[in-house]
């Protein structure tokens, strides 16, 4: 199926919301899947969490400072085992909802949000890129100024102290979120979506890497390297 052909996908959007660059190292029967890859709805994993988080913050059901006990990082939700990436090392224990986002704790997010909403993770890459672009340019049609600021601060903290730390750069401030998906066949997919400012222009970038070959599959390191290359290219 389509799931096996993705290797690496990159999309770059400018301040106006135009996609100015995309590349996909995906070939199926020798044909490039360019546009289909970007518009096909699929499991975007934890990259999609902020989309579900915003309405819950807006309603005041939760706040980012709420605490949640994720225990050892293994949680049974509706008969399905949810595992945090550090479950083998004992989990995060008690953390805030904001930290659950910073550290990409699926258990923390599900325990915090599932009483109020169903966390939807199936979107096309283009939809996810558009969402992060809305945050990048402070599009208040998606939420109040207060929530917008909270999400932007959280995305900045992902890079300064969370799973996006490998993206930290002294020259260009990058903000966003790392993502991960474990497919049904056990294969991994890691990603980063975020934004940065170069020469007074705001760019939004999505990187997805499938079946990462080297080392522990981390969106911060693997997808982050690609984002840094793009930043350096634009910041020449």
Question: Language-model segments: what does each one mean?
Answer:
Residues 20, 114-139, 155, 159-236:
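Active-site beta-strand/loop architecture of penicillin-binding DD-peptidases
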Residues 1-6:
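Short, small-residue-biased leader/transition segments that mark boundaries at the very start
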Residues 32-39, 81-82, 90-95, 102-109, ...:
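Flexible glycine/proline-enriched surface loops and loop-helix/loop-strand junctions
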Residues 42-47, 91, 95, 99, ...:
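Soluble non-cytosolic domains of exported or imported proteins
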Residues 23, 42-97, 103-105:
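Short, glycine/proline-biased beta-turn/loop segments that scaffold the active-site neighborhood
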Residues 7-32, 194, 205:
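A short, well-structured edge-of-sheet supersecondary motif
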Residues 17, 40-68, 100, 115, ...:
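Active-site SXXK
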Residues 7-13, 65-67, 111-113, 139, ...:
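Surface-exposed patches in mature extracellular/periplasmic domains of secreted proteins
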